């Protein structure tokens, strides 16, 4: 799909101050380094300012301070990255699904599918499911019994919703995601694991995005819950009974153990792991690969582990760890001797 807009139209959409010809046609978006004369770019990160003056972009989204010294066409905005995010949808080449049910789809007689929804090839919609207005269900999706997909939802091909999953409005779910799979629940009887039926469901709020191959398990008793505006990257594991507050975001490969509760407006970087049955308060940032082993009750930034260093240095540090107990004992002995000397006594012989 090809889209063309004028600079004047884009300025109106963004409420931007235009410096340049209103009639200039823009056909797409690109980086400062790669943009051509009919493309729009942006400067959000100062480390890319070095590419600005030589950019061939037809126009650039800039803050007022950067626009003053730039000779090219500009759309002056308060937040160039946010402006880029807003207009990116105008140039999105993703095909638009047509309303209707593909002949190869299997839809239960009592399922409710809005006339404006699109059901792709070989999709399966089971008994009691409800598909809202303007929903797009991709090819080979499975929508289990009694599921609800709210209006404006978009499910990429091969998304699986087990039974009793409720999804809010404008939710995006990428391919391979599995929502409502059975939680990892077992009771041990003399060394033998006995399965616990997972009889809860999953409830997902509005404006949520779930990435490729991410799993959200159903609750053991009550629902696993994902709040409004939550963004989940690819290959994330959300275990049973987890609760995630509104507008929290998680990067790829995060793993959250069962019954953990995460607050609103949190950010978890890639590879973060959380043990089960802990609480994370609102407005917490956790850096990449951190292992969270206890509740966090104060907003702020948290990390664990050691930072990257040259291999030879890391090996030396790792070798010293083996001697920490001995070094601690020797330090205690030295502290005792120092205390004795500074207090006017005589040091005792400790071998």
Curated annotation (Swiss-Prot):
A Pfam family hit: Hexapep
GO MF assignments: N-acyltransferase activity
Active site: 240
Alphabetized UniProt keyword annotations: Acyltransferase, Lipid A biosynthesis, Lipid biosynthesis, Lipid metabolism, Repeat, Transferase
InterPro entries according to UniProt: Hexapep, Hexapep_transf_CS, LpxD, Trimer_LpxA-like_sf, UDP_GlcNAc_AcTrfase_non-rep
GO biological process, one term: lipid A biosynthetic process
Enzyme Commission no: 2.3.1.191
UniProt enzyme class: transferase
Pathway the protein contributes to: Bacterial outer membrane biogenesis; LPS lipid A biosynthesis
Catalytic activity: a UDP-3-O-[(3R)-3-hydroxyacyl]-alpha-D-glucosamine + a (3R)-hydroxyacyl-[ACP] = a UDP-2-N,3-O-bis[(3R)-3-hydroxyacyl]-alpha-D-glucosamine + holo-[ACP] + H(+)
GO cellular component, one term: membrane
Assigned protein family: Belongs to the transferase hexapeptide repeat family. LpxD subfamily.
Protein function: Catalyzes the N-acylation of UDP-3-O-acylglucosamine using 3-hydroxyacyl-ACP as the acyl donor. Is involved in the biosynthesis of lipid A, a phosphorylated glycolipid that anchors the lipopolysaccharide to the outer membrane of the cell.
PANTHER family: UDP-3-O-ACYLGLUCOSAMINE N-ACYLTRANSFERASE, UDP-3-O-ACYLGLUCOSAMINE N-ACYLTRANSFERASE 1, MITOCHONDRIAL-RELATED
HAMAP family referenced in this protein's UniProt entry, alphabetically: LpxD
Known partners and oligomeric status: Homotrimer.
Identification of the protein by name: UDP-3-O-acylglucosamine N-acyltransferase
Underlying gene: lpxD
């Amino acid at each position: 799909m090809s889209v063309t807009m004028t600079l004047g139209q884009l300025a109106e959409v963004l409420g931007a101050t235009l410096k340049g010809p209103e009639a200039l046609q823009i056909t797409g978006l690109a980086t400062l380094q790669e943009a051509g004369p009919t493309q729009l770019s942006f400067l959000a990160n100062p480390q890319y300012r070095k590419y600005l003056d030589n950019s061939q972009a037809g126009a650039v989204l800039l803050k007022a301070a950067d626009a003053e010294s730039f000779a090219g066409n500009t759309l002056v905005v308060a937040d160039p990255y946010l402006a880029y995010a807003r207009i990116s949808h105008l140039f999105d080449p993703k095909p638009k699904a047509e309303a209707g049910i593909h002949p190869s789809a299997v839809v239960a007689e009592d399922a409710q599918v809005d006339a404006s929804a699109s059901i792709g090839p070989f999709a399966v919609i089971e008994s009691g499911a409800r598909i809202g207005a303007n929903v797009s269900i991709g090819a080979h999706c499975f929508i289990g019994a009694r599921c609800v997909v709210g209006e404006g939802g978009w499910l990429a091909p091969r998304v699986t919703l087990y039974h009793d999953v409720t999804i809010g409005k404008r939710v995006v779910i990428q391919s391979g995601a599995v929502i409502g799979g059975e939680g990892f629940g077992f009771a041990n009887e003399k060394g033998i694991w006995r399965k616990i039926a997972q009889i809860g469901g999953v409830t997902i709020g509005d404006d949520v995005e779930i990435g490729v191959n991410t799993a959200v398990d159903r609750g053991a008793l009550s629902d696993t819950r994902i709040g409004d505006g939550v963004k989940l990257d690819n290959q994330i594991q959300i275990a049973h009974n987890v609760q995630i507050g509104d507008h929290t975001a998680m990067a790829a490969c995060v793993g959250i153990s069962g019954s953990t509760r995460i607050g609103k407006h949190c950010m978890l970087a890639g590879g973060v792991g959380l043990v089960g049955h802990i609480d994370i308060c609102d407005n917490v940032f956790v850096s990449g690969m951190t292992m969270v082993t206890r509740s966090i009750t104060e907003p702020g930034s948290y990390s664990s582990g050691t930072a990257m260093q040259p291999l030879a240095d890391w090996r030396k540090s790792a070798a010293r760890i083996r001697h920490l107990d001995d070094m601690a004992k020797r330090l205690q002995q030295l502290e005792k001797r120092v205390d004795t000397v500074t207090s006017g006594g005589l040091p005792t012989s400790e071998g």
